[in-house]
Amino acid sequence: MNKAENAMLIDVQVKNCFSFEEQINFSMKADMRNKKFGSNVHKESNFNILKVAGIYGPNNSGKTCFVKCIRCIKSIILNEKSDLQSNLFSKNQICELGVTFLNGGRKFKYDFKFNVKSEDYIYEKFVEITKDQYGNESEDDWLVKDNVNNIYHCKEQDIASALSIVASNNLLIHLVDVNKFKTLSEIKRILISFASNIDIINMNNIPIQKTIDLMKNKNELQSKVVDFIKNADLYLDDFKYVNIDKIVINKKK
């Protein structure tokens, strides 16, 4: 698999997952009518996306559950174990998750539905979204696998005719040899590239000494933490450990 390309989250849709029974939508689309904080907008391929966003709310309003949903999306795409659960107070066993993202300068949307009782992925859809010079968006369906309504589509007819008989206990990209199908191979590459760019940091228990020890030693983890902090603060140019005797303080007269 190729090295992960630059990716940016645009939208997340969640329905009947954890504390969310009704559908919720989280968007990183930038409202260009608002001229404030222009440095917080990333512009690429006619798309405008926020670099940083904050989620605020009282306790038990769903903030942690939303992060859990993103973690589940990442785990499922990377073929890792996930703790996805349907809403406790709903009789509906179908969890619905969707994500729109920018990867390598191109915009994609991936949706899937998971039956927590039968442990089947009953629906998958992958589309590429393009925008013309006038701002009009259009969708190009690469893959549709709808086991409930018996709707199957793929840009490659060789795989489209077999979608109805493929197992559903995992995502399609993990069930077939994608190397035999150009479209599925590209879908898998794009999805894994995107999911590999997702980092979830638990800030609840990080001792200051652990942070200092980490910053003393140059390695891949240190570089990752520094990049994360710099990206989270729009006005921070660098973040590093310096011995006390190397710190220069300019005193105003």
Language model segments and positions:
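Short, glycine/acidic-rich beta->alpha junctions
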Residues: 6-9, 91-94, 104, 220-221
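Electropositive, glycine-dotted interaction segments
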Residues: 109-251
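Pre-Walker A-like glycine/lysine-rich segment at the N-terminus of P-loop NTPase domains
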Residues: 2-72
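Conserved P-loop NTP-binding catalytic core
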Residues: 48, 54, 58, 67-119
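Sterically constrained small-residue positions within well-ordered secondary structures
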Residues: 5, 17, 46, 88-90, ...
